[in-house]
């Protein structure tokens, strides 16, 4: 099954997440089909906290991809 989920990046104690479209059998930070945005949970000041390519997310959801719980919350907040 294709899922839209977060892949962790950044460094120790400074998480940064990419919103990725991937096969659910792949590891969290492993192979992916497409990156459709990012989430920076510790953004400060003018730094961008969330960016989502809504057009591509809607395309993948239309193709039957499932969003993870956290990604679904982020997509709702991005509207």
Curated annotation (Swiss-Prot):
PANTHER family: 30S RIBOSOMAL PROTEIN S16, SMALL RIBOSOMAL SUBUNIT PROTEIN BS16M. This is Small ribosomal subunit protein bS16. InterPro entries: Ribosomal_bS16 (IPR000307), Ribosomal_bS16_dom_sf (IPR023803). Belongs to the bacterial ribosomal protein bS16 family. The keyword Ribonucleoprotein applies. One of its GO terms (biological process) is translation. The gene is rpsP. The keyword Ribonucleoprotein applies. One of its GO terms (molecular function) is structural constituent of ribosome. Keywords: Ribonucleoprotein, Ribosomal protein. It comes from Marinobacter nauticus (strain ATCC 700491 / DSM 11845 / VT8). One of its GO terms (cellular component) is cytoplasm. It comes from the Bacteria.
